[in-house]
A protein has these predicted regions:
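Divalent metal-dependent hydrolysis catalytic cores, especially in the metallo-beta-lactamase
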Residues: 32-58, 69-78, 134-147, 175, ...
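Active-site core of metal-dependent hydrolases
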Residues: 139-252, 263-273, 292, 316, ...
Length: 383
């Protein structure tokens, strides 16, 4: 089958938020990222869209053959407003006056995110990412669960700011992806031409229909509505009832996306220790077969549909010699051989119903016997 594609991962955010914000520097996360990249390939992933972080040097090292890793499509630093989902400053860092709120978070110092306000700053951050080699731009269009100062229901960035960012990206022939959860945020983003919507777990069917009609893609991490999420040892106890309620309320989210014709791409999107992210990725593969009721649909999300989305980067796409996510003449020779039929048994590509109960130590998937990336063999256990 084709090499798999993760449409939303964070290769460079490879520890819990606390250490990344307070204790680590760029050398720590870069070393971790080398391990993360090697394990992506061993798990059968040939391509990863990195959705926030300084992955440019890693991508160059992979392309030069110095590091084993998948093709990386880096977004560069994600772009957030003050008080947005990418504003990870501690409470005292931001202060109470706009004149003393200049301290950067460690996320900004390391190039994981940029906090901007107003059209000029939004344009500068976008253009800086493009200058550094971003294949697409990632913005924070609404609130989130992992950030401290922006409730998940909030709408972020003004229309002028968003349209400035999408315009700057379009001038470079590429597109904008947005973190978002709600109807109000998604519709504002659509008004400005945003093309991919990360998460979106709480949107209505009417908004789904608009995404489909305007050629957008939904890139959700479905573990966000899994009952197992409440068992996360890092989950604050006071949030568990809400997590359980939302999981039940939006249990049909995946089915509704398909019913309304939305193209869906696989996303692991777990930020934290990289061993935890790998467990979450394998769980996500297994869990999606329940939320979309089809192994075939999940395989498309992991391969051909993701390849179509990746190609929207147009002239910023560093890999234009062939298609990704398919096996056909002229496509990139990204192949994995699997001992079993994933249409019948998703576990043969690593899918599992275990998340926090899964072994903490990473082990290769013993049913993935062969991995080829661009014609080069990285795994061969056929002998």
């Amino acid at each position: 089958m084709p090499g798999m594609i993760d449409g939303h991962a964070h290769v460079m955010i490879n520890d819990d938020f606390g250490p990344v914000e307070r204790d680590l520097d760029i050398t720590d996360i870069s070393y971790n990222a080398v391990i993360v990249s090697e394990r992506f390939v061993r798990d059968g992933f040939s391509t990863v869209r990195d959705m926030g972080g300084p992955a440019f040097g890693l991508a160059r090292a992979i392309n030069l053959g110095r590091v084993v890793g998948p093709r990386l499509y880096p977004s560069g630093a994600f772009i957030s407003q003050t008080s947005g989902h990418g504003d990870f400053r501690d409470r005292a860092d931001a202060g109470f006056s706009i004149n003393d709120a200049g301290d950067l978070s460690n996320f900004e110092r390391m190039g994981i995110g940029n906090v901007v306000d107003g059209v000029p700053e939004a344009l500068k951050a976008t253009r800086l990412n493009l200058r550094n080699g971003a294949t697409q731009i990632k913005i924070m269009g609404g609130g989130g669960g992992s950030s401290r100062f922006d409730p998940i229901d909030t709408t972020q960035f003004t229309e002028d700011e968003i349209c400035a960012i999408t315009g700057a990206a379009a001038d470079w022939g590429t597109y904008v992806a947005a973190h978002t959860f709600t109807d109000r945020a998604v519709n504002r983003l659509l008004d400005c031409g945003v093309k991919t919507f990360e998460h979106g777990l709480f949107i209505s069917e009417e908004t789904m229909q608009r995404i489909a009609a305007e050629g957008g893609y939904m890139v959700p991490q479905m573990w966000g509505i899994s009952p197992d999420l409440a068992r996360n040892p890092l989950m604050p106890e006071d949030k568990i009832p809400l997590v359980e309620e939302l999981g039940q309320q939006y249990a049909d989210f995946g089915r509704n996306l398909l019913k309304n014709g939305v193209k869906v791409v696989f996303a692991s999107d777990y930020v934290g220790k990289f061993a935890d992210a790998e467990r979450a990725r394998r769980y996500e593969i297994g869990w999606r077969t329940q939320t979309f009721d089809s192994n075939f649909e999940v395989l498309k999300q992991l391969t051909s549909t993701a390849g179509e989305m990746i190609a929207m980067s147009g002239p910023r796409n560093p890999y234009q010699a062939g298609k990704l996510g398919v096996i056909e003449a002229g496509a990139y020779a990204d192949l994995i051989l699997v001992d079993g039929n994933p249409l019948e048994d998703i576990t043969v590509i690593g899918g599992t119903d275990q998340w926090f109960d899964a072994p903490e130590e990473w082990e290769p998937i013993d049913t993935i016997d062969f991995v080829m990336l661009n014609g080069a063999v990285y795994v061969n256990e056929l002998d």
